[in-house]
Every structure is written in C-alpha cells, then in structure tokens.
C-alpha cells in the first residue's frame, strides 16, 4: 500500500522577538466568530520557530511550517520572509 503524503501545515505571522540564537518568536493572529454574539474577535498565538541563519528581525512578516520537535517549545521552522520590517 502506497504511503500517503502528509500535508505540511504553514502559518503566516509577525516576528515579535529575535533575541534567541537561531530562534524567533512569531505572533499568529486569527479572527474567530464568537459563538453567542456573532462578533468577530481577534485571537493570537505565539510560536517559537527555527531560524537557521538568523535572518529575521523584529517586525518581519514570515511564513513558518510545522516540523519535528527541535526543542521543548520549538516545533516550527522558518520557510520564507515575506516582508521586511521598515528600519528607522
């Protein structure tokens, strides 16, 4: 029996921390409809992602994908930097 290919989970978010070596913290925001009131509410999640070359900085918009656990709290890896933060 042929083994089915797994779909890779990818998310897009903003880098909120790059202080760790080869690790970034990405803020993922999503809109969820409230079950009773019907209003759309912002919900957010912070994920640690592996950044092998330390190329990301705070404010960058990035795409990350799920991977095997690399540390206690790190199981995502950087795929692409979509938009660089504006340097002041």
UniProtKB/Swiss-Prot annotation:
Matches recorded under InterPro entries: NA-bd_OB-fold, Ribosomal_uS17, Ribosomal_uS17_bact/chlr
Single GO biological process annotation from the record: translation
GO cellular component: cytosolic small ribosomal subunit
Superkingdom of source: Bacteria
Sample GO molecular function, one term: rRNA binding
HAMAP family named among the record's database cross-references: Ribosomal_uS17_B
UniProt similarity note: Belongs to the universal ribosomal protein uS17 family.
Coiled-coil blocks: none
PANTHER family associated with the record: 40S RIBOSOMAL PROTEIN S11 FAMILY MEMBER, SMALL RIBOSOMAL SUBUNIT PROTEIN US17M
Pfam name, any one: Ribosomal_S17
Primary gene name: rpsQ
Name the record gives this protein: Small ribosomal subunit protein uS17
Alphabetical UniProt keywords: Ribonucleoprotein, Ribosomal protein, RNA-binding, rRNA-binding
Role of this protein: One of the primary rRNA binding proteins, it binds specifically to the 5'-end of 16S ribosomal RNA.
Taxonomic lineage: Bacteria, Pseudomonadati, Pseudomonadota, Gammaproteobacteria, Pseudomonadales
